[in-house]
Amino acid sequence: MSKEGSLDAPIRHPIDFEHPDFLNPEKLDAEMRRAFDICHGCRRCFNLCDSFPKLFDMIDESENEDVESLKSEQFEPVVDACTLCDMCFMTKCPYVPPHDFDLDFPHLMLRYRTAQKKLGKLPGVPTQLAQIDRNAKIGVMFSKLVNWASDIKNKFLRKILEIVVGIDKRVQLPKYNSETFSNFFKKNKDKINFETPNKNRKVVIYTTCFVNFNKKNTGVAALKVLKKNGVEVQEAYPGCCGMPFLEQADLPKVVEQAKKVSKDLLEWVDKGYKVITLTASCGLMLKFEWPLLLPKDENIQRLSSNVMDIDEYVVDIANNEGLAEGLQEIDGGVTVHNACHARAQNMGIKSRDMLKFIPNVKLDVVERCAGHGGTFGVMKDTHDLANKVGRPTARQIKNKNNKYMASDCPLAGKHLKQLEIDTNISNDEALHPIELMAKSYKL
């Protein structure tokens, strides 16, 4: 007998993308219609991403106002509007497994997108942008030139970039580091020493592509805070976690990255190290998406149980041995943006829990999607839609009237800060929560 949903913890089934039925056109179409019919009868998710308003409008405007009246080609705009944020699955849908309806909307969109990719229907530019390691190595090597050419103030070159590549000229693109965090770590790890008693804790920072190539300061802050708290720190970056490939439905490539990266990280796990991630999306991949794509790979399963988010890890220190003394007040309140891929990890709001240890800090939390969704927020075809989704979130942040905004997702933070600038809120850079901890420690 079926029972009302949202009463049990949601579970996710493995993504069996190699099964013949996964890309079977008839079975995929039938599953899309089944899912859409359930969504049509519920509509609890109407105020999330634009996939649902598009779906409901199409149904309401159809001949018989039902899913069966829709043509299969009408499904594509619904799929295209999904950013794989997972918020419908994690926070809204009452029919996710273990409910009998067994609905996982984001992974169904991923399945449909995989079928599109097989048919050559996905645009080529985002697929090339997903080659993070290749692209970013060039970006770091020629960082001054690339940062100048891609700057939003360089209107001539940005217009050319928009015409040729399709990247919206209005988007503030991430800047490249002049050196990778990996190189910084090798040169400076022994110089950063606070003579703190060792806590018998060992971690390896999985740097993540964004920190390694674009936001070194986050890695530096994490290194200093961990060392301040008596943690032995190592660093590893064998390659990107594969999230950009997941967004482009290149599942074999995600699996390839998972096997490559996990092999390196497991060597540290076998030596007693915990793996620490510095961005929410990468933590989600290592903890959840990799095990779903490779459910029979014992190494992947073992790695996932030894991965922690940096905020999660610092809170764990605080709850056990206690944090090192020296945290001081910071000059202004903090609005924490609890990013979608942090929420999808089901670990609570660890960024807020960590920042609570800053003396007398004013903390506010905004739990709403930024709308960026990887390349979704930068491409001309989808940038306006990303702004539509993110603008209410930026408005909430504005209304909190705090000096700092912190997010575990660097792209979400960048996107929201640009929306803030557009509404004359602030020109300050969005920070990772660990950077505020370093600031409080005066590191």
How should these model regions be labeled?
Residues 33-52, 74-100, 112, 136-139, ...:
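Cysteine-centered iron-sulfur cluster-binding motifs in ferredoxin-type domains/subunits
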Residues 4-21, 47-83, 95-125, 425-436:
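Non-heme iron-sulfur electron-transfer modules
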Residues 48, 58, 91-92, 235, ...:
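A generic structural-conservation signal
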